[in-house]
Amino acid sequence: MAFPELLDRVGGLGRFQLFQTVALVTPILWVTTQNMLENFSAAVPHHRCWVPLLDNSTSQASIPGDLGPDVLLAVSIPPGPDQQPHQCLRFRQPQWQLTESNATATNWSDAATEPCEDGWVYDHSTFRSTIVTTWDLVCNSQALRPMAQSIFLAGILVGAAVCGHASDRFGRRRVLTWSYLLVSVSGTAAAFMPTFPLYCLFRFLLASAVAGVMMNTASLLMEWTSAQGSPLVMTLNALGFSFGQVLTGSVAYGVRSWRMLQLAVSAPFFLFFVYSWWLPESARWLITVGKLDQGLQELQRVAAVNRRKAEGDTLTMEVLRSAMEEEPSRDKAGASLGTLLHTPGLRHRTIISMLCWFAFGFTFYGLALDLQALGSNIFLLQALIGIVDFPVKTGSLLLISRLGRRFCQVSFLVLPGLCILSNILVPHGMGVLRSALAVLGLGCLGGAFTCITIFSSELFPTVIRMTAVGLCQVAARGGAMLGPLVRLLGVYGSWMPLLVYGVVPVLSGLAALLLPETKNLPLPDTIQDIQKQSVKKVTHDTPDGSILMSTRL
């Protein structure tokens, strides 16, 4: 009796799976708030140099005449490229000649200017404080803001490697529990950090734990659910990220101080840490590592929750030993990472799949973590992204089963690229159109993620499938790390980041045309199967004569 049969006996889709899904997907909503938090906690408000005539009461007392703040601003700060007060320069001396009615640009163009030596004055009408206002991450220090976002995303990359190994060694539930604790502690500590480097350090630790939460949530959902119920619970898990986008915008709208906002999205993980102790460990993992007595206890516990206590009582250690012997071998028959790059039939699949994953992570996080550049109301924009993500993810599942994997993959990468490139031509004054294009583009990227997740699983043979998918996810996280840094090109022109964000998905989408279609094709089991496949049509019989087809979704 193999493990799937054991799971069917105790219930593979029942009350327990319902409770478990609610308990595990709820933290995913709050994980999304951590991922998207710096849209708000690192927002850049309007700012100008601190100047004595406006910001020093002693200097104001000595001003001759009755001059209003607009006049004092004009004589203290030169206009910037958009004819608004410059954000990074001020006059060394007040330019009183600018108060004359016939004053022109020539009246101040030769005047000496200097950087904001005494700091900045920020507009607090939208946010009481952000990390930008706390540590003056503007002007010459503006590169530190996207650097903080890249450090967070680097933490997810490192955490995925560490937590993946740890969960295989110590168990899914145990690593998940301590990941909850690390998120709560690191997030709380980050809210109180007095310096920017310490803030980045604790955000890095938080991100590494976030990776542990995401990975082990998916593992527990999959390993405690029957094959028939897995698509449902994994879809709910994916939709948790969509609703998390809406939650992020809602919480940020109500909490305008970055320290309190960081606390607000970290505190719930203390609760998740406490109740996670009552979640069962993966019985499949326990049996695989030889902990049969614990595996038996967990199976009987699940059977009781699913009202199948009688079936659970019939399970014995002998039955579990039989299940352990019948579990498929994990031996990959010599397949390794080098196999992906040195086998002709796999090389181009690996490279193009990695390019598609890279394009998704690069473009999505590059845009989604800089909503200020896409629209004026970032709270509404964040919520709209989540609302649009819901039908796109569910709709993409239907489209790929009808139109094919390759066509949908190409479309869901090229379309957002075109939306982003179109935004270059839209004037900044047309905020609604810019926001609509941004939401549509990010929504399509959500569809691209759904497609590439399924497509890449079907492109590679069973013996090396997880290695290939893991390599592709590394490419996605590497792209996510680089995405925010592209915004630094904005110093050469506001259109430069959008050009890069638009070109990358378009090129990767076109490259996906070189991949073979996998709709209704047999899933390859060995590398030899890949080498025998033609691009258009293959047939592959399993040893018992049946045909193992690719997944319908």
Curated annotation (Swiss-Prot):
Residue list for modification Phosphoserine: 534
Domain of life where this protein originates: Eukaryota
Membrane topology, record value: Multi-pass membrane protein
Key word Transport present: yes
Positions of post-translational Phosphothreonine modification: 542
Catalytic activity reported: urate(out) + (S)-lactate(in) = urate(in) + (S)-lactate(out); nicotinate(in) + urate(out) = nicotinate(out) + urate(in); urate(out) + n chloride(in) = urate(in) + n chloride(out); orotate(out) + nicotinate(in) = orotate(in) + nicotinate(out)
Key words of the record: Cell membrane, Glycoprotein, Ion transport, Membrane, Phosphoprotein, Transmembrane, Transmembrane helix, Transport
GO molecular function: PDZ domain binding; urate transmembrane transporter activity
Entry PTM: N-glycosylated.
Protein's cellular compartments: Apical cell membrane
Gene3D superfamilies: MFS general substrate transporter like domains
GO terms under cellular component: apical plasma membrane; brush border membrane; membrane; plasma membrane
Pfam families, alphabetized: Sugar_tr (PF00083)
GO biological process, one term: response to xenobiotic stimulus
Tissue-wise expression: Detected in kidney (at protein level). Detected in kidney cortex, in proximal tubules.
Residues bearing carbohydrate: 56
Role description: Electroneutral antiporter that translocates urate across the apical membrane of proximal tubular cells in exchange for monovalent organic or inorganic anions. Involved in renal reabsorption of urate and helps maintaining blood levels of uric acid. Mediates urate uptake by an exchange with organic anions such as (S)-lactate and nicotinate, and inorganic anion Cl(-). Other inorganic anions such as Br(-), I(-) and NO3(-) may also act as counteranions that exchange for urate.
Subunit structure: Interacts with PDZK1.
PANTHER family: SOLUTE CARRIER FAMILY 22 MEMBER
Record-stated family: Belongs to the major facilitator (TC 2.A.1) superfamily. Organic cation transporter (TC 2.A.1.19) family.
Name of the protein: Solute carrier family 22 member 12
Organism: Mus musculus
Organismal lineage: Eukaryota, Metazoa, Chordata, Craniata, Vertebrata
